[in-house]
Structures are given as structure tokens and as C-alpha cells.
Design a protein with these regions (language model features):
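General structural concept
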Residues: 74-80, 92-94, 102
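Extracytoplasmic/lumenal domain signature
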Residues: 45-70, 83-88, 99-137, 145-186, ...
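Short, surface-exposed beta-edge/turn micro-motifs
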Residues: 10, 89-91
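Blade/loop signatures of beta-propeller domains
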Residues: 22-58, 77
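Bacterial N-terminal signal peptides
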Residues: 5-17
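N-terminal secretory signal peptides that target proteins for export/translocation
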Residues: 1-2
Length: 517
């Protein structure tokens, strides 16, 4: 199975803060915590390495969310001090696959409001669940909310009709009429990012006939901008990552390559955004891009941006099983093929385009000693044992690296690998701990016995219940496991951590909250 893909990188004029967080209660306002997509909750104090063994299931809420293919929920957003008819509350706001949004009182687990979002397109709504497990007609982009301290908190969510909705987070009511952001219905968009009043997203896999591109909606001018020419699939689950200088980064999958025509498959691209126009600035293409395209080894992740020695360093990777570092000042060098660092092959010796290598997004954090860490989910076994490991990992797990200097150049040094996990989702770091869901999803695509592709129904039947793990961030040692408390698997659902609470949704429509009582 081949997916088209390319990757883009966009520069916004103003510098972007490394994170937007209130001075009061911790929040989680966007996919992977902040615009840089580092998934590092800097303000967690309640859950500690000393008490995490006492983590409990505080509540679970069974919703009536209708699944679409393998899709159910997106990553929850957690926001505090939100005015509701019942007073100020901390809410977990979760978008469901069928264009419904659920707001839950984090303290009690009670539903505060539910908002079914109306179909806005003139194109007809389909009755089914799309085709296969790829284009499932599902809401697929994690929403975003304006950060704490903003004059007005607004919850942005992109529905399957291609329209961007702007909701009051306290009531779910529309603040204004929805805006058409995508050219057609059922495009497959990923994690919304919001900086300087501009909402960005990317689309992938050609679903609904929507051009695979970078999209921007300027809330000040009310205009939508689209990068050109259309690329292959852009499908990092956390959407675009935005650097501290305003550059927007994302990766690509396979597609015909023609640099002169602007068709940059298996690449990272740079665009500037000014006056509601997106313009190509720079790009990086691995020197073995032809082989990556031939073997369907997409660059399929959302990269993470790390401020480092006076510039941003971008960490990327994908199915191939290698990781690379890019310099924001020149992401591919003069020939567009020279990264700061490219690792040896660390995974996917089987050249497996379905279940191995890295998928989703990364995490990055700095410990009290100033050591910069990078974490990545990985499918399948590694090609070598990391210095700290916990046995064989036939299904995969989490890989941890240190960003260090060697011979005057930055490198990623292997540090630890977790125990075995069935489909490790992107990790989250908080207070010296790594929170990760072993999603339990069966990720096979081609049915080698009967031929053709597995259907979504067949993949669902082969999946197993998810597990929540908490690891020591320095060593990868398991400090907590949820065991059999989660009844279903999850697909790209993601977890959020804030204020001593770990919240996520599963395929069967249940939203879970673990925490310290």
C-alpha cells in the first residue's frame, strides 16, 4: 500500500513562545502541548516519581460517540477557570469522530456539555464510514484553544465537512459562523496549531479529493491560505510544528519527486507566511529518497522543535527506522540533502511499511542537569540494544535519546528503550515521568493470506485493550501500569496531562481519567 506524501515548513513573521501556559492551573491547549510539539508538560507537580505507583482510575465516562472506521476520539484539551452556567471549572474537551464535542468536568467526571456540530457544506453528507481504514470520513484533527491569558478563550475544531468551528469552551455555543477551511468534504486533516491568531493544519492521503497541503486561517483577516503545488500525503498526527522563530515544520510520505516543479516527497519543506500568502523557503530531502519512496517508508511523523544553542534544532524520522537533526538556519544545507545528524538504522530491519519504525510524533524535555532528551515511539524490534533496556521488544515501545555534542556537532545518543508495548502511542513527559499508552491497535495493512487490504472491521477485531504505562524519564523503568482497567484499544487518540490528571479516550467511546487522589 502506498501513501503519497510531502512535508512542509512555514515561517510566520513573529516569534512564537515555546509554550503558552497560565500562571495558575496547568493546562493542555493543543496537540503535543505546545506549538513546538514537544509534549512536555512543564507545570505538573501533583504526580511525582515517588507517588506514581498510587495512580488510580478516578473516573470514566461512557459517551455515545459514533466511531468512524478506526477513529473515535482525538487528544483531549484540558483548560482551567472556564466559566460555565454552573460556575468556573477545569474542563477536558474532547472531539469525537462524528463531529461531536464533549466537555467533561475534570473534578467530577460529569458531562458539562455536548455539541453536535451541524453540517455546513453544500456538498451532501455521506451515510457510511468512507473507504477502508484510510479515508473513514472521520474528524481526524486534534482541536486547539486560545492560550490562557487571551482576551477570549475560543475552541477551534475542524469538522469533516471541511469547516472550522469556533466555540465558547464554557457552553459549546458557536462564537461565529463556521468558516470553510478545506476545499471539499472528508479531507483528512491533522492536529490544528494556533500562533499569532492563525490556525494551521495539514492534510494527507488524498481523502475527499482535498489537496494535500498546508492550510492557514487568519482569524484577523478571515482569509484562508493554501500552499502550492499540492503534495503527497502530509500525515504527522500532531499536524505542523512551529519553531520559536515562526517557522512551521512537517514531514511527508511517498509521492513522485520533482524539486524543480516543487514536488518534494519524503522531505521537510519550509514556507513563509506573510500577507495571507504561503511561499516556499527551504527544504530537506534525504539522499535515499528514491528508495524510501519505492519501499513506502514515509517520513510520517510530526517533527519536534528544540531551542538549542541559539537556533532551533528539528528532530524527525519515520518508518525507515532512522532519526535526523536539522538546523533551522539551513535545514538541508546547500544541496538540500545534508542534515546536522542522521542516525544509523535503529529499527525496521525488516523494511516493513505497515507496523515498524516510528509513527505519530515525538517528545522532548530537559532535565534539571541541563541534559536535553528526545523520545520517540517505535514499532517492532530495534536493530541493537540500547544502553538501558528491559528485554526483547517484538511489538516495539519507546526509544530515548540524549541530544549531545560530539566533535563539535549535535548528535542523538541512544539512552534507553522501554519494555515491550503493543503499538506505543506518542509519549508525554511531566515531572520526570514518561506517560505512554500502549494503544493495542493491530496496525497490519495487507492481508498476506487472503490478499488485498485488511478492512477497518478486521483490524478492529485483531486489536487488544490499551494499557497506560508510566516510566522513569531518566531510565525508562516501568513505575506504573494500568493493567486490565482499559476495556478497548485506541487509534491515534493521544493522552493529555495537567493538574495531576491523565486523560484520554478509547475506541469504545469511553473517556478515562487517571490521577492521584
Amino acid at each position: 500500500m502506498r501513501y503519497a506524501g510531502a512535508a512542509l515548513l512555514v515561517a510566520v513573521v513573529c516569534a512564537i513562545p515555546t509554550f503558552g501556559q497560565s500562571a495558575g492551573q496547568p493546562e493542555w491547549t493543543t496537540s503535543s502541548y505546545n506549538p513546538q510539539r514537544d509534549a512536555w508538560q512543564r507545570h505538573e507537580e501533583t504526580i511525582t516519581p515517588q507517588n506514581v505507583a498510587g495512580l488510580k482510575l478516578l473516573w470514566k465516562l461512557k459517551t455515545d460517540n459514533k466511531t468512524m472506521g478506526m477513529q473515535s476520539f482525538r487528544e483531549p484539551l484540558i483548560v482551567s477557570g472556564i466559566g460555565t452556567p454552573a460556575g468556573a471549572k477545569t474542563l477536558a474537551i474532547v472531539a469525537g469522530s462524528s463531529n461531536e464535542v464533549f466537555a467533561i468536568d475534570v473534578a467530577s467526571g460529569e458531562l458539562v456539555w455536548k455539541k453536535p456540530l451541524k453540517w455546513s457544506s453544500q456538498q451532501p453528507q455521506e451515510a457510511g464510514e468512507g473507504r477502508g481504514f484510510i479515508c473513514t470520513n472521520a474528524l481526524s484533527a486534534t482541536p486547539v484553544i486560545t492560550p490562557a491569558g487571551a482576551k477570549e478563550r475560543t475552541f477551534y475544531v475542524l469538522t469533516t465537512d471541511g469547516y472550522l468551528h469556533m466555540l465558547d469552551p464554557g457552553t459549546g455555543e458557536e462564537r461565529q459562523a463556521p468558516v470553510q477551511m478545506l476545499s471539499s468534504v472528508y479531507g483528512k486533516a491533522y492536529g490544528l496549531n494556533l500562533v499569532n491568531g492563525v490556525v494551521f493544519t495539514i492534510t494527507g492521503q488524498g481523502c475527499g479529493g482535498v489537496a494535500n497541503a498546508l492550510y492557514a486561517y487568519n482569524t484577523a483577516t478571515k482569509k484562508v491560505s493554501v500552499s502550492s503545488p499540492p503534495q503527497g500525503g502530509l500525515w504527522g498526527v500532531a499536524g505542523p510544528a512551529i519553531g520559536t522563530d515562526g517557522t512551521i515544520y512537517f514531514e511527508s510520505g511517498d509521492h513522485p519527486y520533482d524539486a524543480k516543479a516543487g514536488l518534494l516527497s519524503a522531505s521537510v519543506q519550509a514556507y513563509t507566511f506573510a500577507n495571507d500568502t504561503l511561499t516556499l523557503k527551504d527544504y530537506y530531502t534525504p539522499s535515499n529518497y528514491e528508495w524510501l519512496n519505492k519501499r513506502d517508508l514515509d517520513l510520517n511523523t510530526t517533527p519536534v522543535v528544540i531551542p538549542y544553542q541559539g537556533r532551533d534544532v528539528i528532530v524527525g524520522g519515520g518508518k525507515e527506522g532512522r532519526f535526523f537533526l536539522l538546523d533551522s538556519k539551513s535545514i538541508g544545507g546547500a544541496d538540500h540533502e545534508t542534515p546536522l545528524f542522521r542516525s544509523e538504522l535503529l529499527a525496521n530491519a525488516n523494511v516493513n511499511f505497515q507496523t515498524e519504525g516510528t509513527w505519530g510524533s515525538f517528545a522532548a524535555w530537559k532535565d534539571r542537569g541541563g541534559v536535553q532528551w528526545v523520545l520517540a515511539p517505535n514499532g517492532g524490534p530495534t536493530t541493537l540494544k540500547f544502553p538501558i533496556n528491559y528485554g526483547a521488544t517484538p511489538n516495539g515501545g519507546i526509544l530515548a535519546f540524549k541530544l549531545e555534542e560530539k566533535n563539535g556537532k549535535p548528535v542523538l545518543s541512544q539512552a534507553w528503550q522501554s519494555g515491550d508495548m503493543m503499538t506505543a502511542e506518542p509519549p508525554v513527559v511531566a515531572n520526570g515521568l514518561v506517560f505512554v499508552l500502549a494503544g493495542g491497535e493491530f496496525t497490519g495493512q495487507t492481508n498476506d493470506v487472503e490478499g488485498g487490504l485488511f478492512s477497518a472491521e478486521e483490524r478492529i477485531k485483531r486489536s487488544i485493550p490499551a494499557k497506560l504505562f508510566v516510566l522513569d524519564a531518566q531510565t525508562g523503568k516501568e513505575l506504573y501500569s494500568s493493567g486490565n482497567q482499559i476495556a478497548s484499544f485506541l487509534h491515534q487518540a493521544g493522552l493529555s496531562v495537567a493538574g495531576g490528571r491523565v486523560i484520554f479516550g478509547s475506541f469504545d467511546g469511553t473517556i478515562y481519567c487517571f490521577g492521584i487522589k
